[in-house]
Amino acid sequence: ECRYLFGGCKTTADCCKHLGCRTDLYYCAWDGTF
């Protein structure tokens, strides 16, 4: 189960495709890919 945009995360692996974990704020943000 992946985390959606603004979902809590520890690493990018926690986030859905095209999202990366912001480790300063610990949420999934768009990584700029389509």
UniProtKB/Swiss-Prot annotation:
GO terms for biological process: envenomation resulting in positive regulation of voltage-gated sodium channel activity in another organism. This is Delta-theraphotoxin-Hm1b. Coiled coil: none annotated. Keywords: Amidation, Disulfide bond, Ion channel impairing toxin, Knottin, Neurotoxin, Pharmaceutical, Secreted, Toxin, Voltage-gated sodium channel impairing toxin. Its main location: secreted. Belongs to the neurotoxin 10 (Hwtx-1) family. 09 (HaTx) subfamily. The modification Phenylalanine amide is found at F34.
